[in-house]
């Protein structure tokens, strides 16, 4: 299935290459700099480097704040070897039991085709279920029996879909936000149940429990 999707994406996502300006005049400014220009840094693409510390945050596409097509042409040429993506449960499962990964595949499979790894964040919640958690920043975890059961099914579905494609996972974004209402006990239980599902499907999964915040 993933091979077919990747083939389709290679055809439908083709766009002319982005020209990265590395000339000495690439930055135009009225600021007077009393120094001699010694040279210009030329970015190296993903194919020219063995490793990179750069990670591009794509978390926001799940709530349609951004579009992968607007940035895709710059990622690999600038040497960005990994992207962080929020899976967007509420966007992938708008109707209970019906998963649509098309929008996420557009980003994930295209990135992999370019040699860019994906770090997948599973949050947020899904208001399609009573007690399914919020779908926004500082959202609360799924809390009801129905919501937690639906979350378990969601984790299983996305893990099965991206098995062999995504190894790096994160469970929830900023669960300790001041308005989230999440407790340490909830966070611990939630992390364990989610990690157990991921590892049952992807034994070599690398799992980060949470991305925390001071806000």
Feature locations, PLM:
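Sec-dependent signal peptide recognition
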Residues: 1-7
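Threonine-centered tandem repeat motifs in low-complexity domains
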Residues: 7-8, 12-13, 20
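Generic secretory/membrane-interface signal
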Residues: 15-16, 24, 115, 168
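Compositionally biased, proline/threonine/alanine/serine-rich low-complexity intrinsically disordered stretches
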Residues: 15-18, 147
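Boundary/entry segment of secreted carbohydrate-active catalytic domains
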Residues: 17-81, 86
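Substrate-binding cleft and catalytic face of glycoside hydrolase catalytic domains
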Residues: 75-215
């Amino acid at each position: 299935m993933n091979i077919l999707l990747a083939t389709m994406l290679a055809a439908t996502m083709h766009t002319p290459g982005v020209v990265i300006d590395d000339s000495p005049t690439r930055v135009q400014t009225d600021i007077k700099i009393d120094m001699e220009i010694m040279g210009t840094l030329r970015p190296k693409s993903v194919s020219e480097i063995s490793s990179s510390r750069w990670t591009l945050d794509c978390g926001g596409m799940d709530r349609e704040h951004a579009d992968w097509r607007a940035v895709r042409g710059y990622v690999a040429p600038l040497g960005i070897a990994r992207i962080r993506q929020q899976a967007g449960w509420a966007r992938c499962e708008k109707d209970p039991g019906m998963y649509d990964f098309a929008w996420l595949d557009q980003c994930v499979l295209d990135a992999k085709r370019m040699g860019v790894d994906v770090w997948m964040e599973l949050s947020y919640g899904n208001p399609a279920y009573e007690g399914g958690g919020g779908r926004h920043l500082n959202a609360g975890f799924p809390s009801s029996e129905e919501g937690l059961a639906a979350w378990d099914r969601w984790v299983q579905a996305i893990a099965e879909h991206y098995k062999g494609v995504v190894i790096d996972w994160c469970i929830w974004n900023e669960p300790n936000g001041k308005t989230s209402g999440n407790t340490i006990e909830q966070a611990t239980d939630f992390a364990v149940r989610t990690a157990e599902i991921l590892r049952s499907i992807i034994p070599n999964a690398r799992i980060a429990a949470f991305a925390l915040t001071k806000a």
